[in-house]
Amino acid sequence: MKAVIISIGDELLKGHRVNTNAPFIARQLGTIGIPVSRIITCSDDPQSIRVAVTSALEEAEAVLMTGGLGPTNDDRTRTTVQELLGRGLVFDEPSFERIAEMFRRRGRPVTEAMKAQAMVIEGSVTVPNTKGTAPGMIIECAPQFAGRYLVLMPGVPVEMEAMMQLTVIPFFEPLSGAFIRHTPIMTMGIGESQLSGLIAQVEDELPSGTTLSYLPHAAGVSLMVSTSGSRKEEVDEQNRRVVDAIVERARSFVYAIRDARLEEVVVETLLEKKMTVAVAESCTGGLIASRLTDVAGSSGCFLQGLVTYSNEAKVAQLGVDPLTIEELGAVSEPVAEEMARGCLERSGADIAVSTTGIAGPGGGSPEKPVGTVCIAVASRSGKGDVTVEASTFSMHGDRQQNKARFSEAALRALLVRLKQPGS
């Protein structure tokens, strides 16, 4: 079985919205061994929808559509598909009751007009919308397209994602005829070419049915080990062996064997070690603190964050020596070290990280160009001694890109220190 994804909406074609639905659907289908052969984006025009659906049903056994199920005039997917298949619309009472209950909870009146949202194509399996109003549908398209299935879902990402996970994937899993295992390996502080060299032997000896993909990201490179086959136990075992071989060779660069953001692993590590953290930021403007506190459970380890953007704030809030700034400049490793030490001592945290740099577009010099950042990590030993280490990095990007990369480097430095023996 293979699939085609159709994303409907003029807003996608005009660039007013980024299509995040198609990648999500493709990833979900991949977990049950259904590859996507094509992704189509088409307008709200009924003829465009009709052409796209007909073409997709001729190509693939499963066609998944998003968009065009709402109550407005440009939501034409349901009507177009109904006419294409020569079927009527029927009222789905459970869907209407779900919609009505949602409106009652919000204190809004329930009207007859809402019944239009609960109309589904005759012969379809209703996909409950647990996050919104319009239900989805799974339609077996015989006799026109024997052995073909059409899935209609709303274009709102949160609604579509719930439908995929709760109903659509469980529906198609028994039909896929294959087992597939995807295992992500997240690395940091290493480029694609260097990583490829480290694991070249593993890649050269990949068993049949297993593939390896490189996906560069801000922290480093994520590897995706994918294994498919007809027997689940064999697929799992083969995938595990390849993952183990890669990790054995690249262990010092691997920070997670799952799809995880760097800040998630930092927080998890802090909680495991029962350690607390504080951050002192200049050029990143609170981004590190924001990323850490975005992680659920971070209140158990995150003490405080200071944005000491000016030199005066560095001196007053962190105890940085003004002579250090005067002699070496605010963007220097000694200043970063004093920021981290001051943050550690004044917060009472077990570990602290600091950033001072030049995000751009102005402020650079030949000696310290835009993209330069100094990052320091300070931590306490078991005896209470403080260790501080700083490094300088050079990034290339616009202001927002540099800030994001600076924060990534700081989180990476934090995690490296946390993983050191004795931390």
From Swiss-Prot:
SMART domains: MoCF_biosynth. CDD domains: cinA. It comes from Chlorobaculum parvum (strain DSM 263 / NCIMB 8327) (Chlorobium vibrioforme subsp. thiosulfatophilum). Pfam families: CinA (PF02464), CinA_KH (PF18146), MoCF_biosynth (PF00994). InterPro entries: CinA, CinA-like_C, CinA_C, CinA_KH, Competence-induced_CinA, MoaB/Mog-like_dom_sf, MoaB/Mog_dom. This is CinA-like protein. Belongs to the CinA family. SUPFAM superfamilies: CinA-like, Molybdenum cofactor biosynthesis proteins.
